[in-house]
């Protein structure tokens, strides 16, 4: 039984305030969760409540969300005497308590902190690891699947300076025999890439972006050339693939219905903006020259026509993030309109674990893949590592093998791999792919 819930304001990896929730039960003591936040957020995401008091934290304070946990959620939830193992009932209670379709009243950051703390308490009450509890809640079959890490090694877009429009360039060690070996391969390529980047762009290029990748690259081709060179020098040509998160909503010009790859330049030449057909052709051209297996958010979040066109004419994994925002209504539309074939699952986009699990199950039912993801404003909380294993998703995106808030998740999966031993398989080499792993 829950005896105490207490929220406080702490800081994320960008130095911005975020919500931490402590939940105490009679039997298993204290359970803690910290909520992440995004930089390039989809407009259809659940609402992250910020104070908007410009005199404090430039308006990014979360004191109202903290107050909502402490004065509204905590007394209401404790009064109900719920069993912490009953995640679905508690999450429904939180959704009903908020009463809005996008969690705008209490705040997605308030609700998610409580939902994840409840999940940890539920696992402890069952005396099982969190990933096993998530698997029970989701009805996931065995064996457990350890995910392929999509490592964001070059940061552009809204995550870094420089002119680079595309937000993330990831290496994908999908041919490794285990998660441990995938981490080694990825870390080796990352270190070589660091050396190559500093050699080409100078010592300052060794500074990293929000997610641990190198930020000082100017064009898409430069980024891809550097990555393929690093893969080659590490000895993994043909074994390590490339994925991109374009985050194209960030540079979509809605009035012109075109895409501006020079969007960081205030004097961008509008004659060089691209139609969605031209942008689709660019992706296909890049995929012919580089080992690209997955593209996330290739088009703007409401440019549905572009997504459908690309889906019909391409043969790699197309991941919806801003398009789908882990929301069942958006996911259903994307399935019906054949817009993409994989979901990027971010728990803070929908704000409860139960709804996140349902989003994954809806995606699996459509034959989609699922990639569990961090946010650019991360914390030391490792819950998504357990979620990706519990959901058997087979893919995780949690930054570069650098910066502790990124590595915390990857290190947790290393521990899970060690704990599970023969009871787990690595998604990249599995003879029984988790779901849509045919592209990699």
From Swiss-Prot:
Q: What is its EC number?
A: 4.2.1.11
Main localization category: cytoplasm
Which major enzyme category is it?
lyase
| Coiled-coil spans in chain | none
| Any one annotated GO CC term | phosphopyruvate hydratase complex
Instruction: Kindly list the cofactors needed.
Output: Mg(2+)
- Keywords on record: Cytoplasm, Glycolysis, Lyase, Magnesium, Metal-binding
Q: Which residues does substrate bind?
A: 159, 168, 296, 321, 373-376, 397
List where in the cell it is found. Cytoplasm
- Tell me the cofactor note: Mg(2+) is required for catalysis and for stabilizing the dimer.
For this protein, the record's Pfam families field holds: Enolase_C, Enolase_N
Q: Where is the active site?
A: 211, 346
- Associated pathway: Carbohydrate degradation; glycolysis; pyruvate from D-glyceraldehyde 3-phosphate: step 4/5
Which residues make up the binding site for Mg(2+)?
Answer: 245, 296, 321
Which GO molecular function, any one, fits this protein according to its record?
magnesium ion binding
Q: What biological processes does GO assign it? A: glycolytic process
Provide the reaction this enzyme catalyses: (2R)-2-phosphoglycerate = phosphoenolpyruvate + H2O
Family listed: Belongs to the enolase family.
What quaternary arrangement does the UniProt entry report?
A: Homodimer.
What's this protein's name? Enolase
According to its UniProt entry, this protein's organism is Tuber borchii
Q: Gene that codes for this?
A: eno-1
